[in-house]
Amino acid sequence: NKGAKKLSTKEKILARLKAAKNVLSGETLAQELGVSRTAIWKAIKELEKKGYQIQHSANGYRYQASDILDAKEIHEGIHQDVDITVLETSTSTMKDAQQAVMDGKRSPLLIVADMQEAPRGRFNRPFFAAKQQGIYMSLLLEPKEQLTELPQYTILMAVAVSEAIDELLGVDTQIKWVNDIYLNHKKIVGILSEAMTDIETNSLKYIIIGMGINFSIPQENYPDELQEKATSLFPNGQATITRNQLIINIWNRFFNLLADQTTYLDAYRKKSFVLGKKITFKRKDQSYMGTAIAITDTGELVVDLGEEKVHLSSGEISLSSIQ
């Protein structure tokens, strides 16, 4: 049961405007909510400052759908009881989640940022972010399983994100082992997960799963070096769904897959575009080339080098051709 919070005047006005078919006058809102018309006007101004688009006319106010990250909408949409924090900007939602542990915040906790400054991917590589055109989020989770029985969180998450995008957009995304999601041969999502262990008991305390999703960054806005490598779900900048919808769908799928862990590995294998392909990878500064032939039940990539087969549990692989 989710804890019911008292709505502020601002939240009540927003809910009322969203539900209304027609223009609502300041007088009507004031009477319904039992506040002054000045209070209504001030609350409307605050909502606009936050980025909500509200049309003004002689007859009153009308809500225009806009893509604002809305903690309340996300909280209500996710079937699990997850605390939601929405930030205007963050240096790293992964670091925010680590800080939340230090601050004694309860889990599961989802931190979503409208913009990520100096975002980093795996191997500490920078990636491109844009305000109100991406989704940058991390989930803090306390696993119930023992260390040996843990699901492959990165793989499970990749399936949840990929399937959510496919369903909402009617597209066919693919996964590059281990944690990147591609659309039309270009990267749209990167996923990271890390574990926090209790040093004294050597037990797992928390898992943090983070991701960056290129949502509606116009293709021409990507730097030259990323033009051939990265794209957005809506490269023309015109989104047909909201970020809130995608966030809700992703986490509902994630929690469903987590509850029934029998299906995600097969789904991941089906969506992998590296199986059967020639790949290169580095080990101890030496480059190897082989064919990716399987993904094991523990998420390792099996590569046939000809004279032997090797299992990769992490690291970067390159494909001769993504096509």
Residue ranges of model-derived segments:
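Residue-level signal for inorganic ion chemistry
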Residues: 40, 93, 137, 180, ...
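N-terminal lobe of the biotin/lipoate ligase/transferase fold
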Residues: 6-158, 166, 241
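Long, positively charged amphipathic alpha-helical accessory segments at protein N-termini or as interdomain linkers
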Residues: 3-35, 49, 146-147, 155-173, ...
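Short, ordered beta-strand-loop transition motifs
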Residues: 55-58, 176, 295-296
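Short loop/turn motifs enriched for small/polar and acidic residues
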Residues: 59, 178, 184
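Glycine-rich beta-strand-to-loop/alpha-helix junction loops that act as flexible
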Residues: 114, 178, 209-213
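A short coil-to-beta-strand element that immediately follows conserved catalytic motifs
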Residues: 109, 172-176
